[in-house]
């Protein structure tokens, strides 16, 4: 794969990996953590999801739409994002301990996990052969992600500072974490 395409893919895969770590942490907390810890983790995960999807849609998907002949895979990814957004909106109306809270987040995690697999195995490999402005696209993705993470009070993570892929968050719970 071209170096330029791989830079974008690495950036987005870092987000995907962060989400998968959060989903695994949710499963552990669901089986024995406090409701407060569960609520905080879900809020963090939903914020991560919203930031990632917005950056991806506004930059990568827009560039892919201009460069791809067959838009079916991209359209499928957009529909998956819409489904995930609906589930995030549903989570925003709930509190840990509510009926269906754990089930709703589990469905959200499952939908997003399938979407991640779809992107990484079908959509990302197509990028290599496309005529995309990789340098500016990578810069735009990084900058917009940083801006959104700052806006939501989320620390930017530096993979070199982390221990073997574990992500640490130092975010105070926000009672109004709506992303709309």
Model-derived regions, located:
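Small-residue-biased structural context
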Residues: 1-180
């Amino acid at each position: 794969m071209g170096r330029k395409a791989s830079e974008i893919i690495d950036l987005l895969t870092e987000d995907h990996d962060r989400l998968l770590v959060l989903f695994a942490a949710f499963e552990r907390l669901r089986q024995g953590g406090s409701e407060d810890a569960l609520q905080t983790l879900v809020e963090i995960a939903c914020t991560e999801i919203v930031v990632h999807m917005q950056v991806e849609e506004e930059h990568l998907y827009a560039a892919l739409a201009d460069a791809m002949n067959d838009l079916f895979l991209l359209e499928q990814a957009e529909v998956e994002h819409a489904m995930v957004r609906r589930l995030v909106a549903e989570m925003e109306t709930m509190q840990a301990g509510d009926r269906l809270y754990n089930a709703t987040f589990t469905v959200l995690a499952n939908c997003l996990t399938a979407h991640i697999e779809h992107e990484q195995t079908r959509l990302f490999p197509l990028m290599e052969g496309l005529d995309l402005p990789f340098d500016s696209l990578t810069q735009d993705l990084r900058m917009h992600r940083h801006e959104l993470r700052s806006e939501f009070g989320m620390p930017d993570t530096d993979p070199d500072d982390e221990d073997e892929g574990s992500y640490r968050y130092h975010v105070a719970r926000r009672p109004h974490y709506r992303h709309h």
